[in-house]
């Protein structure tokens, strides 16, 4: 089986050519550092409204590594990801246990790293977790639910309340630690579709640091268009 476990410099050589290259997102921690039996998928930056997708090597029986340029906005990246998710899920040759990961650069360890997203289900444009939870209130009643929003300025709100990026992890952890009713806390993630893919990955990894036996991250992610959301007369 093929195995990825290479330095960042070597990877940049692999993802560059004469006319195109992929500028990977950066983060300060490695979620995963190697992956076996993989197919690479590339999304190149042309401009802020066009993505060039190279998916010729996407073999449905392998793990897929998504190498996506950090400059691309979510509004062009996510629909492409959704199409590829659908293709793999509905392939007659899919392999049980195969995963999908995003690649990024660990700026501290100076290595290539990976963030799994196999179970993520994207909801786009008109959906937001606050309304989704309300529609499915019975299913979410047994949990503590936090709507975490990353707006178009990449600022954070939790249930409509502003919170500094540096305070988010401690805020959620403190809540989970001091709650003794036995309920699991679920974080529901929302991203303005104008955010770049680089910002998206950094925010995802920030939230990943919270994953524990008391705190879960919802598999639903909301990539919203603020102009298409219902008017709730509230802060998102």
Model-derived features with residue positions:
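Positively charged n-region of N-terminal signal peptides that target proteins for export
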Residues: 1-4
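C-terminal motif of bacterial Sec signal peptides marking the signal peptidase cleavage site
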Residues: 13-16
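Long, low-hydrophobicity, acidic/polar, solvent-exposed interaction domains
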Residues: 18-236
């Amino acid at each position: 089986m093929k195995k990825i476990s290479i330095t960042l410099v070597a990877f940049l050589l692999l993802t560059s050519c004469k006319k195109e290259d992929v500028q990977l997102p950066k983060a300060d921690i490695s979620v995963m550092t190697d992956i076996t039996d993989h197919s690479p998928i590339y999304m190149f930056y042309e401009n802020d409204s066009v993505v060039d997708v190279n998916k010729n090597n996407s073999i449905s029986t392998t793990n897929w590594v998504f190498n996506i340029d950090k400059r691309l906005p979510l509004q062009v990246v996510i629909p492409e990801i959704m199409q590829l998710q659908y293709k793999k899920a509905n392939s007659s040759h899919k392999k049980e246990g195969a995963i999908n990961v995003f690649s990024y650069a660990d700026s501290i360890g100076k290595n290539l790293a990976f963030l799994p997203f196999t179970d993520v289900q994207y909801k786009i444009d008109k959906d937001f977790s606050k309304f989704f939870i309300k529609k499915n209130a019975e299913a979410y009643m047994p949990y503590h639910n936090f709507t975490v929003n990353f707006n178009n300025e990449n600022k954070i709100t939790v249930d409509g309340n502003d919170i500094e990026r540096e305070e988010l992890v401690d805020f959620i952890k403190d809540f989970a630690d001091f709650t003794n009713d036995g309920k699991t806390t679920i974080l529901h993630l929302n991203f303005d579709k104008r955010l770049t893919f680089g910002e998206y990955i950094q925010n995802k990894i920030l939230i990943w640091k919270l994953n524990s036996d008391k705190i879960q991250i919802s598999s639903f992610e909301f990539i919203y268009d603020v102009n298409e959301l219902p008017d709730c007369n509230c802060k998102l």
